Structures are given as C-alpha cells and as structure tokens.
C-alpha cells in the first residue's frame, strides 16, 4: 500500500463485525502521521508515497486484487481508522435488505464520514476504479470528496455534488456537478435528488480523470469524505472494470471481455426483473466495453436521468478527451448523439464491425501539446474510441428505448493521421504586454509571447517553435543564461507560473504563485533562482524568490522568500555576477536587494534631488569578459523625464546623472548634465547596456544608441509607435526593440540595417479573406486597421488604417488585385493593391457592416449591416457599382460575423441569416429572387429554448448542401433545394460555432467555437470524429482554408496558421450518402422528437416552407409592406444614394409620389463636408418660418438615417388612429377619476427628474406626466400632450418643468409644454420641431430654454422663458446627441455629436439673439467618433461620454481634450458630475461611480495627463440601458430610469439598488383580481406573470417563462377562499397552461392541452375546472388537480377564441339542468353559451349566436375582437361587441332568445368590461379613448389618457376600481358616485 516515506510492514488481518456493511477482505493498516510531508509554501504540497508491503513481501497492489472492500478493510464500524461527524447512523435498507450508513443533515460540511481518520494519513489504495454504492436522500443534496495523489506527489481533490452548478477546475481541485434531471417538462426537480432516488453504483476511473482533465498520472487514493445527505452501502477499489448488469453466466455464454460484478458488490435483483429496472449505474469518464443485449431494445425510457450537466468553463487542456458510457445496458451513447457532442478519438485503424470486444492501440491526446508531439501517450490501451471532447459530466441513464446498433459504432471513422492539424506559424506579438522579447544565448533566435502562446523565432530562417499550455495571456517571461529554463506567467489571477525545458519545449513545473498578478520575472545567470514581482489581491507590491534547482530533475519549485513592499517597482533584475543580489526601480525609488538565509532585504539608494523621478528601467553594466562589471559594477537607471542615472551598487550611491535631450542637428553633442527643470527630455521607457554602448528606447518612437558617456547619439532608428523595450544581443551587435503598436524587430549595428521580425494587430481580429493567386491574406481588426499578409513568410505587406472608422468585414476579389472592406459606419470601400488606395466608396448601409462575400466568378459582391439591409454590387470591373438595396433582409445583429452571408460554389445562390435570426434564406445571386426559407427554430423540436442560426456555409462545388451552425451547439446540414435536414453534427464545446469552413474536397469541416477550433471528418455519416485544438486566449472569430487547401487559418486574438497533415485521398467508403437517404432518416428522427417533445402527437413534421414566386416588380413588393428591394443604375443618371424610410422598415407602405433628394451635406457616396474649427456665425432664420424648402422636405421626405446611438428617442410604432373630438363630462361630474399609473416609459430619454431638496419627483408614461410623492406614493397626473413624451427638464429653482412630445396625426409639430410645478398647470405651449425633441435644457439663470430636435429634425432652438418667444433656430448639418448649458456662463452651451464637440455662444444685439459656433474635432487618439453624452464638472471641466465607452475630459477654456479613459464596454448615454464624483450610465446596463477629484490637477499637465489616477468606486448592474438619472449633490443617492421600464433608487453608500417604479416592458395581455381585492395579477408578451398589491400597486411576485408569451390569465374564483387555494392559471403561446400558487410563490402544474397559442382562459365557478381556448378555436376542459384534459370542444374550430367566461346559475334555471353557465366567443363573430355540471360530467350547448360582419376590407385599421360577457346584474343577459354591421353594443336575453337592446358606439370596440357593483360598462377603442356607459340612466362619458389602442378594460370584483391598458401602460381609475 502506498503510504509513508519508507516501507512499513503490517500483518494481514481478517475479521467481521455484525451490523457493519460490507464483507471480509484482507486488510492492512493505515500509514501513520509521518506518511507524508508538506513543503513550506502551502498549496497542496508534495505528497510522495513509498511502496508498502504486506507480510510475506507481497507488493501492495497484489493484496488489493481483485478488489478491496474499503469499509471492511478500515473497520469503519469501529471508528478508529475513520471518523464521523454529525448525524451518521447505521440503518437497514429495505431494498438492499442489509445494513447501510445514513448520513444526513442540513449542512453537508458538518455531517460526513471520512477515511482515514486524519488528513495526515493516507489510504494508499492503488486501484484504478473506485466503486461508490450509494443512494441520495430524496430532495436533498450530497457531496463526495476524493483526495487523489499523482505520481509526482501532487494531491488533487476530486469532488462530485449536486450542489455544484458548473464544472470548475484548478491545478489542485476538480469539481463535477452531479445533476438529477427529469425527462418530463418539470424543471423544479432539477438539481436535488428526485423523490424516487435509486441506489446507484458510481464507478470512477481515477486514472483517466486525472489524465483527461489535468494531464497527470494517477498514483493512489489518499482519502475519502462522504458528506450529507446520502445512504452509502460500501466503497470498493479495483483495477478491474465491472459491469453490475452482467452475470457470470451471461459473460461466459457470450464470451464477453467485461467482468461481472462480484457477488459481494452486487445489488440484489428481484426475480424476473433486470438490474437497470431497479438501480442506476454511472461510469465516469469512460466505459470498458460495449456489451450488446437484445432485451434492452424492449425496455422503456425511465423518467429520470442522472448526469453532470454541460459546463461553461474551459479545461486546462481542452484537447484531452473524455469518453462516455457505451454499454447497451445504459445506452448513454444514444443520449450523447442528441444531447451531447459525441466524438471519436483519432487512431490509425478503423473500429472493428464484427467483434464485440474492442481494444485499440495507444493514441495521443488531441491537445496543444500533441501538436508538437512532445507529450507521450497517456495510457496503454483505449477501451473504446467514442469520446466526448471538452465535456465534464457524468451520465447515468437507464435504457432509452432507442438502442444504438453495433454497426453505428463501427461506422465511425478516424482521422489519418492524428492529429490532423499542426500549428505552423503565428502572426502576432504581445497581447497583454509588448515589453517581453528575449534573445537566446547564441543570438540566433528571439523568444516572445503572443497572447497565450510563447514563440521562439529563428531569425535567419523565420521558423517558429511554440510553447503551448497557458490558458490566458502571458504577462511575463524570463530565460536563464544557459538557455535551459524558460519561465512564464499568465494574467488570469491567481497568476500561474510555468517552468519550461527550453530545449525540448516540455513543461517541467506548473505552480500557483502567491501573487495575484505577476508583472515581471527575472532569472539568475545559472537559472537556480527565479524572482517575480507583482501585486497581491489587495494591490500591494510583492517580490517572490523561487528555487528552481530541482525542477529539471523532476523536483518542485520552492518558495525561498517573499516580501511585501510599499514602494513602486517598474523593473526588477537579478545581477548576472551575483545571483544573491538584485536591483529594482520605480517611481522615486532605486533599491538594491539581497537574498540571504531565506530572507529578501532591500536598501534604498539615496537619489537626492532626483527622488521624484519616474524611473522606468534598469540594466547592469557588462564587462568585456562577461563576469564582472567595470568600476566594481555599475547600474544604469533611466527615467520618463530623460535622465540616466549611473549608480555604484557597492557604494549605493549615484555617480553620474545625465539628461538626454532631442538632438538639434545630427551629431550635435548633448550636455553631460543639465538642470533638472531645463528643457523637455526624452521620455525613456527602456534601456539596455553592452560593453561599450547603451541602447535607449523612448516614447517618441526612437531607438537610440549612445556611448557610455552619453556624449552623442551614435545611431537611431524610428518606429511607428512608442518603444516599449530594447535588448542587446549577447554579442552586442544587434539591438532588439518592441513597440506598443505591436512591432518587433532588431537593429544590426555594424550594417546599420533594421529588420522587422513581427507585426501584430493590437485588438481582436474580426475577419479574414485569402487571395487565391498571390498567396495573400487580408485581416480586419478592432484596432482600425486593414492588413495584408504574405502567407508564405507571414510578413505584413500593406497596412490601411482609419482613425475614425473600424473595419468589420473583408473580401478579396477572386480575379483582380482588389479587395473590399466594410466598416462600422456602414461604408463599403474598394481598395487597390496596385495603387494602395481607395478605388470607390459606397455608403448605402445605415448600420455597421456585418459581413461581406463575393461570388467565386467575381461578378457580384454582397454586404449586410446591423440594421438588416442587404446590398448587391456589380464588381466585374474595378469600378464597383450598386445594383440593389434590400431592407430588412438580413438578421439585425450588431456584431460582425463573416459567416452571416454565404455564396454557393457555382456562384448562383446566396444564403444569409434573415430576416430574423431563426431564419435562413437562399436567393438567386443575380436577381435576389427568393428560392427557399428555412426556419431553424423548428429543426430541434426537443429543445426547450428557441434555436437560431449563428453561421452558414455552402458545401463546395454544386453538391447542394448548406451547413448551418445553430445556437444549440450543433451544425445542421440542409438540402439547399428542399430544405430538408440531411444530418447533424454536435459541437464538442458548450458554445455555438460562430464560423464554418469546408474544404474543397469536402473532407474536413472547420468550426470556430469559443477559443477552440473543431475539425470534423465530414464524409463520415454516423458519429463523425472530430478533434479540438487550443491556443487562442480569446474567442476565435473566423476560420478558413488557404487557397491551396494545404493549411488552415484561424483568427481571433492573433492569426494562427495550421498545417493540414491529412492526405486528400480517401477510400471509397468515405463518400457521402445520397441526399435522399439522409433526408429520409433525418425526417424520421424529427418525427420521433416531435412526438416526444410535447404531450400531443404532431400531424406532420415541420418542414421548411417554399418561398412564394418572386414578385413582378420590386415596386409592388414595397407597396405590399414586405421586404423592400429596389434597383438603381448609374447609367440612368438617378441619385446614387437611396435610403429606405423608417416607415418602410416597419412595414408601412410609402406615400405615393415622394421625391427623394440627396441631402446637401452628402449622405451618399461622396465625402461629407464638415464644419471647420473656427468661430463662424450661424444662420438665423425667422422664428416663425422654416429655414428653406429643403429643410421642410428633409423632415418629412428626406428619409434621414437614424444614428447608431441609443440616445435618440424613437417613438414606439402605433397603428391606432387619433380621435379629433371627445365628449368630456362636465368638471366635477366625472364618474372615473385617474388614481394611479403603473409603469414608466423606458422608451423615453431623460424623461425622469428628481429634486432632492424639495422632493419633487416626476416621470413620464406614454403621453402623461406623473408627479409622485415618494413618501406616500400618491400621484398627480398632468394631461395635455397628444403623443408620447420624449424628454423632461426641470429649471434651476425647480418651479418650471418642460416636457416635449413627438408629432403625430393630431399634431403636425412637436408639443413642448411648460408646467407650473406648484400649481400643476400648463403655462404655455411651444411648437417648432417637426419630428421629435431629443433634449431640453434650461440656462443657469432660467432665462433661456434650448430645445434640440432629433436626427430627422436637426434643429437647435433657443426660447425666452420670459416671453416664450423663439429667439433663434439653427439647422444642424448632422445629428446631435446631447446639449447642455455652461453652468458658469448662461450665454454658452455645448453640443456633442459625430466627430466633434460644438461650442455655441449667444450674442445679443438689441432684441435679436444669434449664435456663434466653434467646432472642435475629437482627437484622433481617442478613437471615438461619436460623443453621446456630456455634463459639466468643476470649472472649467466638461466630461463627455462616447459610443465606444470612453469618457473624455475637455478644458472649456482652451477647447481641448486633455484626458480620456475607458469607462465602459458600450455606449455611455448618461453622465452626471458633482464635486469629485462622476456617474456614468450606458447601454450595457451598468451604472458606475468614478472618483475624479484629481482631474483638475491633471488638467494642468495638459496632454501628458494620464487617466490612471481616475478610478471606479462602485458599480451596479441594472435591468436595462440607462436613459435617465438624477442624484443629490453628494452623489450618494439618486434615482435612475432604464429601458426596461424601471426606475431604481440607488444608494452608493450601501451599494444597493431598489425598485421604485416597475412595469411591463411589452404589451399587457390581461389583468385579473383576487377575490378579496387585495392583489391583482397581470401578464405580458415577455412571458411574465406579475402579482401586485392593489393598495400600493407595488410588485409582489413575478413568475417568468422564457421564450414564450403569456396571452391570458385567470384567478381562482371566490369559492376558493383559503390562502392555499389562491392560484393563478396562465396560458402561453406554445399551447401550455401553467398553474401558479400565490401562497407558495411556485408553479404547481404545467399542462399542454393545446397545440397552438392559448388566447382565453377561465376557472369554473367552483375553481375545480379550467376552461381554455386557443388560436385554432378549440376549447379544452381540464382538471387543475390532476392535470388531465377530459374534454375538447371543436365547435369554434377555424377562428381564435377571444373570450371565455363562466358564471353560476340555479340548477333548473333557463330550462336546463346544470349549476354553471359559461360562454365562448370567437373571432368569426360567433358566441356559444353552455350549461355544465362538471361533477356529473355534463356539458350541453344552450345557445349559439352568430352576428353578421362586413367584409374585412370595410373595417378600417386593426380588426376588433369579438367579445361577450354575462351581465353582472342579470346573468341571463349577454353583452356582445365586435365587428358587426354597426358600431354598437348588443344586449341579448337568454330567456327571451332575442336581442333586447342596442347601444351605439363611436367606434368598434377593442375591449369591454362590466362593473359588478353598479350598472356601468366601459368600452375601449383603438382611437386611444374609452367610453363609460351607465346602463341604468343611458348616459355616457368619454375619457382619454392612453397613448395607444385601449385593448384591455377590467373592473375589480367590487366595482370600485377600473384597470385599463394600452400596450404596456396600465391606468387605474377610481369609480365615483354620480
């Protein structure tokens, strides 16, 4: 037995004690406390075990064979060599009929059994397999911890628990979630053990777990801890793989190679039953063999499955593969084929198809290490070749009923050779830092990092060698003097350090440093000492020294010393002449270090007057012999101010100080020492010293060589960016330099020639394109560059950059030396490689370009943008011209994806994802006529989530296959003609494939999945094998084959070039099967899935629908409201630019005879003219007239383009017409009074104000201004606007509120209302803007109001608040995003927008007022072209937020920007500043608090200011983009509004956010009330059911169902009085019905009685029956207690059910028997009335009413629904409204069988409600109004308040309150007495 440090002998014992689980086995004692030693430094430590022997000298492994009973061996019942804690007891299990241990308790960590007794002991069990016989306690959690020792002495903890939600791994811990999941739709059982949890045999392959997940070799099992809650029978270890379901007789008869479970370990199986009918077998991670069993084919699928769920985090070695279970007794292979990605390990031989026993040769793991073929094989045999790559889960499932045939496994083919890809080259440098580049000892190679890869580049040959293994970017490098050891650290905290054998490339040691992050590493000359500098988790600087002496001999790296420091360290270096001495420098500090006696000590050098210098780098002087330095050792230190300090490290004193200044002329001498404050020195970032010269790199981009006396510059080389590091080669003849712009090269001093070694993109690469003739590749990146590379040399050929525009997509022309590039601005440019310039530019897109693709014949180019437009170009010649522009064709996705578009190999077809992300459309490439449209969401019927397309790719040639990558991590192969699914390939990663590429011979399929590359053996039909390759540290954005098909390219953080090792020749058996055969098999699978996914059988499999014939003309398509496509010809002389209006994009038909003129500022292909930066007077138009005829047209017919900024207000699209005349009741006689409004308009912008000093709080909802008292919750409502309100503004004294609404059909222009806050009255109405008002702002003295029009209006208007006159109005050249007055000067205001910031000065000439304008462009260094928000800080600071997430600070006195920092990942729409605090809110839902107190001090530094002093104090994530915010003067508390319709109270002091106002974001479909009127419930299109307190209208409970809409709702009737009986039933768009308990706040039942969407639902009067109607007209009757649907009525089939209502009746009333009366109304104007007695199963049709309706074309606008309701004051009277011959309400008597009354209405009714308390009826109309009818007196009153069609009216049960809804607005009205 493996145990202590030496061999120990013990006697073999036998014995048994009654009542103890287990049986007799040989036993050996546990090793004592001295069995292992822990090294200093913590962590897992080194735990090496020596062999142990039993008496008689038998090796330790022998006595454990064939298996070991762990409980018996360690006598668990005595608790001497084991321990227990908490509730642990021995009980008798009824199923096993034996004694078992029960471990239970609420806290797992406090209730457990542990073996051995103490952690200092070791079990020393060497068996490969551990068998855990246990049963989870129902509805509880459990945890199993295993401490496993590796051959190198490392202890790894392996844990399994159903508490874990995801897989987690580190170098010392593996956590596997053990998830119980049902195959039924109930999700509330997921996670905890099921109520019918079974005894489980958990079989763990400890050897494979360590090898697959950590790459380590298993030694022995050290300890076990079983934690609550579970029952455990026993534990066993063995080297044999047992199958519990196979008996000895079966194994012998079938000659199986598996071992039957020993009788002692077996569970009892009742006679006549199978093992799997009673128990569960879990094998993880592999199975030993495939055991076919014919009986298994007849078994049924069990209701539960136990598995470890799909994980999201990455393995340290994702390429190392795990294996799933393949036993026919537990056919997990079948489960993997549908739910989990199956994969085949590569091997040179095929799987045998006849033999039942499979054994294969040794195979290497497909990982980064296997690419170099440096890692030896990890196992002697591979029992099976089916694997799951990259997954971390355990499956335990009973027979599925669809067993996998033996031929299916045999048909899986293997890659030849293995691996199929080998990394050849990497284009890139840096990643985290660009300062690390090292020379090798011989000076022939350079070592540098590229993100997570370390590259060794041979200078002469250009050959690259790689060190792979890091999972994050490399932060530091160090190479010892003899080139034997290489050390590297990675960024991800806690920082991991790898120690490499530099010659072989193998990793000698991987250890966790005590540092949170490491920024510097330094070796001693011999390599025995490694020093590291970094930060701990608290931000303190730490220096660590490690001993690496034993690393090369298989030993460990030991921490020698560690010290915390308070001073800054920028550079740290171990002296080459004495490895116990070091030096460091930083801000104002140079320290000399010494390591003695395991302690690091340092002493500061007295710098005197230079103590405030910012020191950046240091270097020891070199001697001629390389052993000792001249002058007893000199240390050179450089500074950011240009000073060079020479320090004698022995005397610890400064010898010389020189300051380097830029030379006035070549060779001009510089002073040896100059005054500290004189001149501007060279900002030195790095230096390196040789025997006679010193190399200096500076931030001005120069590398300069100086003599050691620094008398003159010997040589200099200019770079394209600041130099970050310099380094002399060992011979001193070459100087290596790196720049912050990703440049790596060296200067050859003798020849004075500079050689470029590597260039790099400085941001993620988004897309690539290869040129077929010249071997070139183009890449585009977020660093605003387009680069052309030579694929043979990996060198950069061209570099095109744009400071204002980001390239997003690229495509080479197949025949001409041109390429096309799409940009974030929507421009598509054609570049010539011959002239290195732009040939033509097109700006037809409104959004960022997402994809570019060109046909293989070079005729057509296609581009798509984030707004969904598709543009077709003719590119047959160099002058590319636009052919067609189609709107709303492509999926609107803001992220660039090169695989959204795809062209077929014959250039005849174009495929794209669109018009929605669930659709894939194929059109003709020449005409864009639609050929096929496939709904991807119907391809995976078993999924509970909506599936959508991510990437597409045509198969090569004309094979007619289209490959679609879906969001469910699958690649679906479709027939491009019929749309049938031919096959599916499951991704081995947990994320979807964002890029696809298929080789020309259709043998290899590439997919980019997160940070990995997956390669499939595409011709294999069943379970195709695949391999996964790592190396990228960020997501891979695109993959492609080179034109010669010999290499693979992947781009993401860098550019990787892979060699394809597979030969293109394949045997004939690998060709694809005929499409027809595949389609047939696939359809069958879909049919099975369809019938299993829902409770009802499907009539047919959902198949892609064939598109309609192409329209006769594109003009007709536009008028139909369908996808807009139109053509232009450059030869016809028409306008080159054609925009699609907002109305067309929303499906509206355009107004006839609309003339589209090009805007004067250039919205088309021509360059835009921008205003200058000088002060110019702005044109002042007449206050009462428009500027010009063109200005008038631009607002209506100019079809402006909406900016790509969420700051701009866009009114919600409405189809409801406005009524021009409303009959309001006299004042004081209103029967309805508006009491409360539920919700906040998240569609507005800056539409919420709060004044902390007065407590005034106002916000908007629709066209109402809501003024709310935050203490009492009472509301006041200011009515007056006729359209949706866009923004609010409160003046400085808080007495005036301005509100602006957009224009509409009742208002030709926008309304701006001026409100008196104390009185709540409208003082004045202003009108000037044509479309919408973007922003309002009061001047500091409240004399002026400035109003800013939106992107379509573009007018800046100034108003006098004294006279309310328009003083000035200016037409802007481009949209402006924000405006603000200068708080210190009422005559100055500032606007922010595109490319510039604009200063406006008010000049008063008598009664006239005009503007003077000064435009200041945005500095190119910011890289931000859109400023979207602004606010003033301390004078004279102005803070501006950008669309790219930057905050820049301007000095308004000088008009210059002096500081900027990255404040967010998205667009910043809100900025607030007060004192030393700044708040930013963005569309990423984040609200951040910044400390900006140092900014005024930084202003004095000007352009040299750095943003590192600005830091974020707090951050909160809200539920939507931030659109409005108000805070107190101290910025401690405030209120914030989001696009989700929520207003939050923010407390920065507590770091909390509390909901103040909440509402539905989407349409409200129903409102219901509790019988006692204490609560109400609403449901919406977003799938939410919300329960509100009726007294306070505060949200109490919310039930959310994802990806479904909740369309109807009902509350249990008054007969259910008890609280536990209070339930809400909701109907959803997928046909499901869910019952929610209010008291338990949980879903109690889910039913699926309908195939289509539910449209109406109601309870019976006793609450024991649910009536539901659907879109097809079916009415289902169900029991909520049992979930059974016992009756379906189809009388209304063909028309949707619009209303269902039930009421009680006397048993014999109306001449029929029954206690309940209920009705159903349908959309075809029919109403059925039924009498029922559900307890007696009686339901009879009482009456059938059908009302005449006009033709559909006669009804204007939206069709009204058919509604009916029982009259509360006479239940025998029916009230009906709908689409009839007249607008009226019909009263029908069930007793008289006739219509007794008709009440005329002004319009067709959209909603109806009758009051139970009085004879009142409310009817809602599409005209945004409603009418209250008093049925007793016959009077009527009209009411307004809503902004859209009033589609919902509901009285409360008492009739005191009325709820009305229009879209997401809910208004609560109080009913008053007459």
Curated annotation (Swiss-Prot):
A GO molecular-function descriptor: microtubule binding
Residues in WD repeats: 469-512, 514-556, 563-603, 677-716, 718-757, 760-799, 844-883, 944-984, 988-1026, 1031-1068, 1280-1325, 1328-1369, 1371-1412, 1422-1460, 1462-1500, 1559-1598, 1601-1646, 1649-1688, 1695-1740, 1800-1839, 1841-1874
Compositional bias per record (Basic and acidic residues), positions renumbered to this chain: 1066-1075
Parts of the chain that traverse the membrane: none
Record-linked Pfam families: Beta-prop_EML (PF23409), Beta-prop_WDR90_POC16_2nd (PF23393), CFA20_dom (PF05018), WDR90_beta-prop_4th (PF23342)
Subcellular location: Cytoplasm, Cytoskeleton, Microtubule organizing center, Centrosome, Centriole; Cytoplasm, Cytoskeleton, Microtubule organizing center, Centrosome, Centriolar satellite
Function: Microtubule-binding protein that plays a crucial role in ensuring inner core protein localization within the centriole core, as well as in maintaining the microtubule wall integrity and the overall centriole roundness and stability. Required for efficient primary cilium formation.
Entry keyword annotation includes Cell inner membrane: no
Predominant localisation class: cytoplasm
Modification Phosphoserine, positions: 16, 20, 301
Originating organism: Mus musculus
Name of the protein this chain belongs to: WD repeat-containing protein 90
The keyword Cytoplasm belongs to this UniProt entry's keyword annotation: yes
Record-stated family: Belongs to the WD repeat WDR90/POC16 family.
Sequence segments annotated as region (Binds with microtubules): 59-267
Any one GO cellular component localisation term in the record: centriole
